[in-house]
Amino acid sequence: MFAKLENLEQKFIEIECSLAQPNIFNDQEQYRKLTKTHSDLKPIVTTFQQFKKLQQQLSENKELISDIDPDIQEMALEEIKKLELELTHLEYELKILLLPKDPLDEKNILLEIRAGTGGEEAALFAADLFRMYCRYAEKMHWKVEIMSQSDSDTGGFKEIIALIQGDNVYSRLKFESGTHRVQRVPTTESQGRIHTSAATVAVLPEAEDVDIEIRPEELRFDVFRSSGPGGQSVNTTDSAVRVTHIPTGIVVTCQDEKSQHKNKAKALKVLSSRLLQIKQEQQEIEQADARRALVGSGDRSERIRTYNFPQGRVTDHRINLTLYSLIKVMEGEIQEFIDALSTHAQTEALKMQATQIAS
């Protein structure tokens, strides 16, 4: 590990020298590549340099143990304990920083939320979840664009799909996929009984043209008039588009735009991301990587989180984390869950790495 860190530090120094050259801006593509690599390496190199600095201090304090002055010996022993603890922490941090990055982490995402069991109450909860993610996106200065939505009769969503664009969106929200369960008293409940409903969340990395190749002969397009809640027609032209990917049977419908061309473009974007998700899941099964182990089978029927309104708590069942701040969570304050899930995934990845080395 330390030989690799030395090499990375040397590479970092060389890049800094290159970036200091006056003619570096002549090649903009090379400049962007170097600044990106420099940015990626900086946390690792900075931590490694701090590690080496503490190692030097540890060595100096160990030499002081042989001093004839007992007070100096005692001070040195106390400092050694402190330094050894800090070095253990930094070594663990370096192992985390050296873990392979998920190549999808920097991508934008398609967020898909669907009402599950619970009828209209599930649709209302789906709307609450969408609002929660929109609030979080606002805090992160991300852009949210609704791609498709199917409204329920009471103001909820049977289904809603949105494109979220910004820095490292997928890396932050990728662990939100799964079944989210709510326990609360519906507004229509006269007896005050608590009902349990659910909605599924799918976080798909946005597919780019280089990620997925879709041949025209694999697609079937159908057009029809768009409709609103209850099935009433909201358009007099055939602007809604249904795209079927024949090899997989995946069907995507978009009818939010008045333009058939725009609906078609949105439908193809959603389809591409779903196909990319299938491709990624197949790779994960083959590699049995740490993220796959974290989210289980990937089956969206798997309950991952419960929102209990009467008790004001939210529990993530994957990591046994409960927060008694439900109102804040529903307002988009979900960073504590995101950080805990990310840390858990890193820990699992380290365990898997250690197992592979041992075998």
UniProtKB/Swiss-Prot annotation:
Its predominant location is cytoplasm
Residues with the modification N5-methylglutamine, per the entry, are: Q232
**Keyword Protein biosynthesis appears in the UniProt entry:** yes
GO cellular component terms attached to this protein's record: cytoplasm
Q: Which GO terms describe its molecular function?
A: translation release factor activity, codon specific
Cellular localisation: Cytoplasm
The record, for InterPro entries, names:
PCRF (IPR005139), Pep_chain_release_fac_I (IPR000352), Pep_chain_release_fac_I_sf (IPR045853), Prokaryotic/Mito_RF (IPR050057), RF-1 (IPR004373)
What post-translational modification information does the record give?
Methylated by PrmC. Methylation increases the termination efficiency of RF1.
- Keyword annotations of the record: Cytoplasm, Methylation, Protein biosynthesis
Q: PROSITE patterns in the record, alphabetically?
A: RF_PROK_I
The residue stretches assigned to a coiled coil in this entry are: none
Entry superkingdom: Bacteria
General function of this protein? Peptide chain release factor 1 directs the termination of translation in response to the peptide chain termination codons UAG and UAA.
Q: Which family, according to the similarity comment?
A: Belongs to the prokaryotic/mitochondrial release factor family.
User: Which protein, by its recorded name, is this?
Assistant: Peptide chain release factor 1
Originating gene: prfA
